[in-house]
Amino acid sequence: IGNIFCDADCAGVYNPKCVQASMGAIFRVKTFYTDLPVLLNELKQEGLPVFGTFLDGKNIYTTALSTRGLIVMGNEGKGISAEIEALTGQKLTIPSFARNSESTESLNVGVATGIILSEFKRRM
């Protein structure tokens, strides 16, 4: 990961709880606060794939993934906005391992990010 892009509604990456949770890793990447719709449009025009994480996306373990691009992680409570969803080229999901209908609907965004990044790295 070289860059993290945040919108105005994102939790402050330098919030003490965020810094502690990252174990200092936040200081090894470049962080930008930006207008995400503008950024995503620019990156798509440059040919970079934009992946989004959704409850109704394609299974991350069986979907073709790129070795480059941008991954959008949604807010834990609200998910990804409709505006940002329209700019994602591929919708991904982490499948539930529950064998019954009482599965978890969503994961903590930090846990979900770790799982998603791990799968991209595994495929490199």
Regions found by a protein language model. Give the residues of each.
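Active-site-adjacent beta-strand anchor residues
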Residues: 33, 74, 110
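Hydrophobic alpha-helical segments that mediate membrane insertion or helix-helix packing
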Residues: 4-5, 72, 112, 116
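Structured adenosyl-cofactor binding patch, chiefly the S-adenosyl-L-methionine
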Residues: 13-24, 82-124
